[in-house]
Amino acid sequence: RRNYHQGLLGSELSFDEKVKAYKINNIFKGDVWVNPQSPLLRPGLNINIGDYIKKINGNTLTKKYTPGHFLVNQSNDEVGLQVIKKNSKNRRTVTVKTIKDQKSLQYRDWVEYNKSYTHKHSKNKIGYIHIPDMGVHGFAEFHRHFLSEISYDGLIVDVRFNGGGHVSQLLLSKLARKRLGFDLTRWMGVEPYPVESPAGPMIAITNEFAGSDGDIFSHSWK
């Protein structure tokens, strides 16, 4: 059976009845050094949240004929977008290269939002780590945030939607390190003992979608 891969713009859109175009409500940023960004962030396009997309490849968008209609089988292809700037009637056509998958972009934005929310509403007293699975991705994601987030007075470890794997024991062994004191070093200042030990109390967040080794992690935490 033939597959028709959907072209994606790495954004959230909604139809605006007044403008008769699709408003850009959000543009996923993602990671600039590993995964592709949203096509709308391509240098020189000058497309921003609040702008509108009126046409795709010359096809006028309507409430019935959505961007998805005209991006079928257009993944990783260059397409033309007619864009209307926010608070302007001027229209211009730009060329963007669509992407096949935007889950990694959405995930990164979701994690960064959660972390920022936690820091802000705890007045920078609580750290946040999300572990997406107990495999290569989860192991890397854990260590990406671990060293910076354990310096806060408390820590939230989020394993919701964890896809499982086999590294829960390694992560739990690090999180279980009890800070006993500090070393006053000659050159490196004050270092916690043991090193890489959490500074304060921790809680874990889980849900019914944490499976396999993610479920074992949740049970072991209790």
Language-model segments: what does each one mean?
Residues L9-S14, S116-K120:
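Short, surface-exposed beta-strand/loop micro-motifs that present aromatic residues
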Residues R1-R2, N26, G30-L41, K54, ...:
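Cleft-lining beta-strand/loop regions that shape enzyme active-site pockets
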Residues S11-I47:
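Glycine-rich active-site/cofactor-binding loop and its immediate structural neighborhood
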